[in-house]
Amino acid sequence: MIPNDQFLLYCFDGTRQPVDRLARHLAARAATLPELRTRVAEVPGGLDYPYWVRGDAVDVRTHDGGDWVAGGGVRGVREAVAALFADQLDPRVAAWRLHLFGPVVGAPRCTAEGIVVVLQISHALADGRRASDIARRLLTRQPPDIDTVLPGRWGPVPAAAAAALGWVGFPTALARTVVRGAGAVPARSELDRRTEDGDVPPPADPCPPTSLNTRPGPARDIRLLVRGRADLAAGGSTVTVGGLTAISLALERLLTVRGEDVPGALTAEVTVARPRRGDEHNAFGNVSVPLHPGTPVSLRRSLIGRSLRAARDRAADPAWARIRAADASVPAVLARIGIRGFDIDTPPPVVGAPPWCRRWRAATAIWCWAAGGWRSPPASPRCRRPWG
């Protein structure tokens, strides 16, 4: 299972309630949120995509000073949260977990002892926007909306039926994938032509990998930099642009200190939200944004903002819907094979502008496999609606 947990950290100043009491309160609230009453159920044999089914696990954990550092310092909380990255969720058991640390001394911008709350949530359950909304409803003071419990319990008959449906539907899904994949070829040609004509922004230039483009080891480290929105969105830019500017400066300095060349095409892969389709849990895509190293900070911020807008405009072009149409129909068996065959240890020769087979993923899987060169990155977590 590919690690994909998100960690949303919140700090509350001057909380007077004991941590254990707060944990019981939040556990009761979590039981009222439908999204937190679900888990993933695998289809036997992997013959179809997993289903969302009802799950009653409520996992709220408290961490006192003995778990991290004597005195409850914020440094100990950072170290404890970093250690959580190694303890990934199994969404087949529970797709979320809540951690409470407190009382915490010395938290940024806190005037008294505080409580740190960390929502650990599987990306299969929610993207960043959806996860933030869940956290907001979990931690708000207002009474939560009592919604209907999501249907379905996983039993032997539904499991067998789901496997049978996946097996019977395989030929149709495969044929649909081939047809849609073939339709992606003219759509791609059209996009390239419109790019050459200047109607669509061009993609970012490819960037040679640096020492940062390697698989990280098991150790994690966390630093907290608390900044106001106005600090990052200075000069009429956005928080995203301000953050990318800071990252650009940091990467440039780090590579220089390491004695490495700073690529002129230094690029960041940025997650960009898109309109949500139906009841999907993840509605985002990644775009490559040049970081413009070597330019003055004020100009760099402007250039990054312009590059981000161009990348968003390119990603929103209608041609991509036809290019990626086969993703929605690729059989689960083939998707699993592609994910298992993805090499996460060997970096590609260039980053920021993936080659044709990697960019089209499932839409061209058949032809890429035939050429023996498919190295598709794992797709976003995908599950079907509740079964039962």
Across the structure, where does each feature detected by a protein language model lie?
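N-terminal ordered "arm"
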Residues: 2-4, 14
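Extended, hydrophobic beta-loop-alpha segments that form or line the acyl/peptidyl-thioester binding
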Residues: 384-388
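His/Cys-centered metal/cofactor-coordination and adjacent catalytic loops
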Residues: 22
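Soluble acyl-CoA-dependent acyltransferase catalytic core bearing the H(X)4D motif
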Residues: 9-19, 27-31, 38-383
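Short secondary-structure boundary/capping segments within folded domains
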Residues: 1-2, 347
